[in-house]
């Protein structure tokens, strides 16, 4: 099990990213725009720099929904490899069977 504080911090970051995604993407588009003036681009960059770091989606880290484990994450199932193996062997994941050939 991961520390509860680490999981809580990650959840907080996810909420911040969702809340600020639209504003951040608009500012990024202005900063990258070919038609915007240099002053507008500079203002957009300054506004982006003033925003909290945790509002950037790049700071998110995938964690297992069950244990909070940050490594060995399987995106398709949103759980770690260890939880996946346990659940698959117990038949708790529909459509997943042990391979045999």
From Swiss-Prot:
InterPro entries: Ribosomal_uS14, Ribosomal_uS14_bac/plastid, Ribosomal_uS14_CS. SUPFAM superfamilies: Glucocorticoid receptor-like (DNA-binding domain). GO terms for biological process: translation. The keyword Cytoplasm does not apply. PROSITE patterns: RIBOSOMAL_S14 (PS00527). One of its GO terms (cellular component) is small ribosomal subunit. Pfam families: Ribosomal_S14. The keyword Amino-acid biosynthesis does not apply. Keywords: Ribonucleoprotein, Ribosomal protein, RNA-binding, rRNA-binding. One of its GO terms (molecular function) is structural constituent of ribosome. Belongs to the universal ribosomal protein uS14 family. HAMAP family: Ribosomal_uS14_1. Part of the 30S ribosomal subunit. Contacts proteins S3 and S10. Binds 16S rRNA, required for the assembly of 30S particles and may also be responsible for determining the conformation of the 16S rRNA at the A site. This is Small ribosomal subunit protein uS14. It comes from Chlamydia caviae (strain ATCC VR-813 / DSM 19441 / 03DC25 / GPIC) (Chlamydophila caviae).
